[in-house]
């Protein structure tokens, strides 16, 4: 069995992408001195260094990297060593211009950025094998080596190529996936619009067409592109396993739905030795700490509930959004420790030292342009001390309460053209249901539709347009065996080939929900509907309505107006020992909370309404009865959290975000510890006070 934790790293990981090739070697000594001051335990190296490591085909220059790894080892810093295959050198593209990717419109990308790769290119695969093999042979036994980091952020910025090499590869993939051209015709429904194929050679990638292309073909191409990238990862991984046994292999995911939509992370999670993730706050008006928690929960779920590692996030502002605000004092540590609460075994950043040149020179870093006399640096040092104080949580697992079903294949299918309402967004529904669960202080596991759900009292399906028959059976068995299920509209509609399930909607869910949908009637942008329910309570919906016909389900809320006035809007179906709820419109936040609360009662989940809003409460537990409570106060008010048992506060008084650092002189709390200076090991009992902006971590006594 492969190693699943960084080799030789016995603390929480703390550090970042280190790009010393951007600086004179005279700076390296200062770097390692500052790393020791900050408590850095690991850095990622060499991710974009292919042109320096292999300046011409087959000639390797590892001298500078030898000196660097020796220096890091001398100072006790572990190394996450990259295979630099995300950025082939200019000489490679000069020799193989066909390896540059082609868009669906037929435009070939040019050299001069990163990630410009056709993953079907035989020349690219051979070159990647060469540099990976050379690195593995040279550094496989280096004492600083803790982890292999293959490529970088697969799936962005290029998720698919449409060149002739990919066309040939796609045809081979289709034969492996379907077995025959006749099976492809059946799966794609090529009888529609006269698209029948007589041979594989007639099939091309779904390039630009006069109108909407075949949706099943487009869906298969998404699968093919993801599988092709995964083939290349496996090729590098297998080389590293063979030549450097005992060193785990990873690649950095981007699981946040706001940051990558082209990778099936359920499949990728099975390929890496250690799941790692990059996460960046999106300045799109959403509550960023909720998006962060969701990404962390999704990453942990991709890891099967096991500990994972945050490999990149930012100390402050980024540089690639329309507006890139700085993080407020204390926010960096709250972000970092929120990831740790939800299963990460540390907090790594992009990057160690802020670049003077290049596309990301305005992206924040651990060592900013202003050096060490800056708020960011002081917060970095404080966070390093805080992570050292939390070393004992290593190896524990986050404790979940409920599950949310998510499937990338369904997302891909729903995002294809010509759907009933383009305003129905799977990501928006997932975000909204997650936010409702978050505000009810429930920790979420994400789950594949065909996975074992028996551990969860409540399972939510926010958007599952594509559902296999196996997934439908799985959800039915879950409810029959005592589970509580909540399903949102436009779920269970098509099978794995984007073909509508036979019979009335929602085909894969009719039995478990006890209803059929005769027709849906999407709403216009300015339309709202009122929904009346128990005790005169009213809910509000928009975007979508349906004509629901109960077939065993009871009507709980009814449309009071709109196209489906008088008909069921929210239903409840008792099946076996469990209950299935169905929501046929897009509810606003208050209305959605009412449904989740009612379903939670069915599931026997105790209300946590006494906990304050925007105070994040998460537990980790491990062998030997170890239990830890993380309390992160994202609000501007001090908060009190009731404790069922006594415990011991673990974090030191590492003051960050004090009044001197804030523009208006108002304390925003501390990065770790508390504003009042709780010393390490202070007993707490009955309640835990968490100042505004602060983080507390308690070792519970039982």
Residue ranges and their predicted role:
Residues 105-274, 278-292:
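Polysaccharide-binding and catalytic clefts of secreted carbohydrate-active enzymes
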Residues 30-37, 42-108, 136, 235-243, ...:
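Aromatic-lined substrate-binding rim segments of carbohydrate-active enzymes
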Residues 2-27, 32-42:
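An acidic-aromatic substrate-binding cleft motif
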Residues 22-37, 128-134, 257-268, 328-336:
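Short, acidic/polar
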Residues 16, 35, 43, 72, ...:
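Conserved, mostly hydrophobic/aromatic
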Residues 13-25, 46-63, 110-129, 151-159, ...:
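The substrate-binding groove and active-site-proximal loops of carbohydrate-active enzymes
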Residues 9-14, 39-41, 73-79, 141-146, ...:
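Short, well-ordered coil/turn segments that N-cap beta-strands
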Residues 200-203, 207, 246, 273, ...:
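Carbohydrate-binding surfaces of carbohydrate-active enzymes
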């Amino acid at each position: 069995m492969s190693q699943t934790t960084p080799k030789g790293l016995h603390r929480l990981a703390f550090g970042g992408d280190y790009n010393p090739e951007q600086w004179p070697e005279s700076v390296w000594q200062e770097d390692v001195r500052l790393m020791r001051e900050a408590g850095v335990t690991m850095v990622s190296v060499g991710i974009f260094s292919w042109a320096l490591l292999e300046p011409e085909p087959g000639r390797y220059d590892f001298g500078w990297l030898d000196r660097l790894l020796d220096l890091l080892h001398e100072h006790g810093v572990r190394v996450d060593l990259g295979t630099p295959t995300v950025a082939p050198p200019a000489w490679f593209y000069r020799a193989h211009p066909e390896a540059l990717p082609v868009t669906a419109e037929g435009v070939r990308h040019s050299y001069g950025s990163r990630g410009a790769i056709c993953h079907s290119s035989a020349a690219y695969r051979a070159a990647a094998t060469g540099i990976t093999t050379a690195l593995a042979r040279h550094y496989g036994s280096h004492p600083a080596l803790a982890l292999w980091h293959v490529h970088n952020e697969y799936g962005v910025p290029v998720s698919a190529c449409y060149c002739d090499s990919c066309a040939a590869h796609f045809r081979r993939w289709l034969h492996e996936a379907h077995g025959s051209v006749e099976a492809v015709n059946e799966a794609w429904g090529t009888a529609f619009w006269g698209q029948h194929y007589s041979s594989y050679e007639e099939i091309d990638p779904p390039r630009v067409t006069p109108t909407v292309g075949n949706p099943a073909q487009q869906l298969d191409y998404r699968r093919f592109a993801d599988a092709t990238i995964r083939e290349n990862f496996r090729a590098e991984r297998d080389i590293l396993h063979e030549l450097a046994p005992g060193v785990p292999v990873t690649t950095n995911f981007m699981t946040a739905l706001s940051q990558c939509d082209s990778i099936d992370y359920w499949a990728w999670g099975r390929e890496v030795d250690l799941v790692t993730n990059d996460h960046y706050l999106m300045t799109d008006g959403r509550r960023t700490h909720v998006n962060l928690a969701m990404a962390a929960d999704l990453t942990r779920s991709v890891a099967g509930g096991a500990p994972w590692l945050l490999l990149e996030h930012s100390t402050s502002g980024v540089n690639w959004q329309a507006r890139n605000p700085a993080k407020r004092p204390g926010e960096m540590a709250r972000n970092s420790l929120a990831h740790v609460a939800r299963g990460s075994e540390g907090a790594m950043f992009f990057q160690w030292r802020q670049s003077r040149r290049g596309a990301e020179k305005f992206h924040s870093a651990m060592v900013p342009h202003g050096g060490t006399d800056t708020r960011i640096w002081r917060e970095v040092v404080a966070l390093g001390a805080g992570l050292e104080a939390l070393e004992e949580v290593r190896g524990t697992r986050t404790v979940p309460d409920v599950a949310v079903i998510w499937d990338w294949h369904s997302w891909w299918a729903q995002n294809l053209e010509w759907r009933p309402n383009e305003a129905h967004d799977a990501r928006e529904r997932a975000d909204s249901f997650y936010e409702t669960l978050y505000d009810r202080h429930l920790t979420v596991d994400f789950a594949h539709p065909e996975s074992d759900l028996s551990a969860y009292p409540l399972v939510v399906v926010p958007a599952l347009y594509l559902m296999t028959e196996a997934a439908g059976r799985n959800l039915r068995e879950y409810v029959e065996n005592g589970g509580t299920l909540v399903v949102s509209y436009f779920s269970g509609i098509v099978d794995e080939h984007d073909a509508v399930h036979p019979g009335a909607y929602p085909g894969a869910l009719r039995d478990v929900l006890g209803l059929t949908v005769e027709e849906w009637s999407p709403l216009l942008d300015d339309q709202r509907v009122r929904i009346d329910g128990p005790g005169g309570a009213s809910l509000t919906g928009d975007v979508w309505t349906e004509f629901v016909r109960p077939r065993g389900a009871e009507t709980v809320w009814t449309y009071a107006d709109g196209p489906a006035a008088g008909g069921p809007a929210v239903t409840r179906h008792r099946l076996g020992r469990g209950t299935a709820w169905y929501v046929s419109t897009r509810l606003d936040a208050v209305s959605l909370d009412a449904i989740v609360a009612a379903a939670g009662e069915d599931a026997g989940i105790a209300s946590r309404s006494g906990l304050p809003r925007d105070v994040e409460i998460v537990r980790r537990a491990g062998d030997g009865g170890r239990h830890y409570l993380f309390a992160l106060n994202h609000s501007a008010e001090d908060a009190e959290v009731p404790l069922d048992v006594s415990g011991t506060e673990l974090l030191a008084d590492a003051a960050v975000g004090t009044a001197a650092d804030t523009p208006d002189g108002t304390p925003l709390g501390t990065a770790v510890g508390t504003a009042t200076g709780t010393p390490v090991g202070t007993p707490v009992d009955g309640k835990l006070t968490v100042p505004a902006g602060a983080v507390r971590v308690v070792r519970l006594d039982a």
